[in-house]
Curated annotation (Swiss-Prot):
It is a lipid-anchor. It is found in: Cell outer membrane. One of its GO terms (cellular component) is Bam protein complex. The gene is bamD. It comes from Mesorhizobium japonicum (strain LMG 29417 / CECT 9101 / MAFF 303099) (Mesorhizobium loti (strain MAFF 303099)). Keywords: Cell outer membrane, Lipoprotein, Membrane, Palmitate, Repeat, Signal, TPR repeat. Part of the outer membrane protein assembly complex, which is involved in assembly and insertion of beta-barrel proteins into the outer membrane. Its main location: membrane. Part of the Bam complex. HAMAP family: OM_assembly_BamD. This is Outer membrane protein assembly factor BamD.
Length: 289
């Protein structure tokens, strides 16, 4: 009987304690809420402004050189008025603002997003142009990797192909020429490295790439002279003579031709083109820089 009475007396005590544990925090929270009832919660909520107002504020900031503020305004249009005409315009202008700031990765990302959503709009070639410019601005000298030059080339070629009448085509072609020149310069840099170490086969491969793939760049003259030098060192005199002949035909006043001619003359040889050589065939495509 004693144990039974004890067991019965603990249950009500536990119920009272549980009730108190629920009531006390509630009273505390109510007190806190009543003491802070004047807090302005509106500052935690986006202040929605008309899309055209935000967009024009973005343009004004952009024209004034306040690029961070411009980006914020264009982003606000996209966030507060998604899928509206103003949001579409803000997306491409936001990409341009990022480009102006030098935030090239962000500019590329925004412009690519624009093209994915609006590939057929009037601003689509402009978005493509921004992507190309963002890659172009990151091109490094020829001693370093030329990934950005390849990306510039591809992006600008796509622009010229897809929008041939666009106002951006002329500048895109200039960027294409520059990117090609960079890529040719990289091949020459590697080719010279191999030539200095008398690794002639590897050197020829690089110089051949320049002649065949970058025939309209300023590096073709030197590439033909280096081919003359490499083939001559390998004992392939017919190829050496052909390289010199093609060089002389296209660049008769070139110092590189004079050096190649002198090299052949040192062994009683002269430039003579072999029509069956790959060099002769590639030479017909040379247009000069």
């Amino acid at each position: 009987m004693f144990f039974k009475r004890v067991g019965q007396s603990k249950a009500p005590q536990r119920s009272v304690l549980l009730a108190l544990s629920l009531v006390v925090p509630s009273l505390f929270l109510s007190a806190c809420m009543s003491s802070e009832k004047d807090i302005d919660l509106s500052k935690y909520v986006d202040q929605t402004e008309p899309a055209d107002v935000l967009y024009n504020q973005g343009l004004a900031n952009l024209n004034a050189g306040r690029l961070d503020e411009a980006s914020k305004k264009f982003d606000a249009v996209d966030r507060q008025h998604p899928y509206s005409e103003w949001a579409r315009k803000s997306m491409v202008m936001g990409a341009f603002a990022d480009y102006r700031k030098g935030s090239y990765d962000e500019a590329i990302s925004s412009a690519k997003r624009y093209l994915a959503l609006y590939p057929s709009t009037d601003d689509a070639p402009y978005a493509q142009y921004i992507i190309g410019l963002s890659y172009y601005r990151q091109i490094k000298d020829v001693t370093q990797d030329q990934k950005e030059a390849r990306q510039t080339l591809q992006t600008m070629q796509d622009l010229v192909t897809r929008w041939p009448t666009s106002e951006y085509v002329d500048d895109a072609k200039e960027k294409i020429r520059f990117a090609n020149d960079q890529l040719a310069g990289k091949e020459m840099q590697i080719g010279r490295y191999y030539l200095e170490r008398r690794e002639y086969i590897a050197a020829v491969k690089r110089f051949r790439t320049v002649v065949e793939n970058y025939s309209n760049t300023r590096h073709v003259e030197e590439a033909l002279a280096r081919l003359t030098e490499s083939y001559y060192a390998m004992g392939l005199t017919s190829e050496a003579q052909t390289a010199a002949a093609v060089l002389g035909t296209n660049y008769p006043d070139s110092p590189w031709y004079k050096d190649s001619y002198k090299l052949l003359q040192s062994n009683g040889l002269s430039p003579r083109e072999n029509a069956g050589s790959w060099i002769s065939k590639a030479g017909k495509l040379i247009t000069g820089a």
